[in-house]
Amino acid sequence: MKKVMLVFAFGVAVLWSCKSNSIDNPENLQPLNIPACVQAKIDSIKSIPVWNPPASVYSYVYKNQTVYSFSADCCDQFNVVIDANCKVICSPSGGITGNGDGRCPDFQKTATNETLIWKDSRKK
């Protein structure tokens, strides 16, 4: 019986220490080197009611630079891609046609290293 309790306690300790932040707490997905202006945009979104669908931010490498894609706050809006200085590069998707603003038609094919930076996990 002591061995069973010891194994159980060890298993609980292992599971507790292996908790995954990306599953349990999406807020912790942000890397430490996120640009201040991108963080400010995320903080701004957090200060208003939850979007429908909830906001998300992904980083990509596009044309040899790290860029950030912000989801739109509602239907038929552009999904905006910005650089590390928060300069708008383009909107590769969204809008009435779903094809974006046409300024980066190669984004879907050439952007690499998609990484979820933040997803709004608040409930409506």
Question: What do the PLM-derived regions correspond to, one by one?
Answer:
Residues 14-17:
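C-terminal motif of bacterial Sec signal peptides marking the signal peptidase cleavage site
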Residues 2-8:
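Sec-dependent signal peptide recognition
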Residues 27-51:
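Short, non-transmembrane alpha-helical segments in secretory-pathway proteins
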Residues 19-22:
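Bacterial signal peptide processing site
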Residues 86-87:
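Residue-level signal for glycine
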Residues 55-74, 78:
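Exposed beta-strand-loop-beta-strand "reactive/processing" segments of non-cytosolic proteins
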Residues 94-124:
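C-terminal partner/receptor-binding element of secreted or periplasmic proteins
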